């Protein structure tokens, strides 16, 4: 058994600008809660989005759960836009085309939980 406190999870990838053609539209930071190999079943990260930054439309090969930890953001699929804030939990089924990110006037952060081995395929350029 392990206990994690959000404030104790190391920022493993400082806020960087992702190169053109990658999944994010701007600067993000990543904290790896479960480092690769520590769980045979799950991958868990905390993703921090700068103001207005989002990821592009994409799909996952497994279900995804997002737990909003800070700021204001959106989770969007092909037919719905959900405005989210701290404490909201979003379930995204395997194969659903979607994006998530910060509102235009707020940074945003969420925990992302997926099955180990999950593949992400970017749909939007």
Which residue stretches match the model-derived regions?
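Short acidic-glycine-tyrosine-enriched beta hairpin
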Residues: 79-95
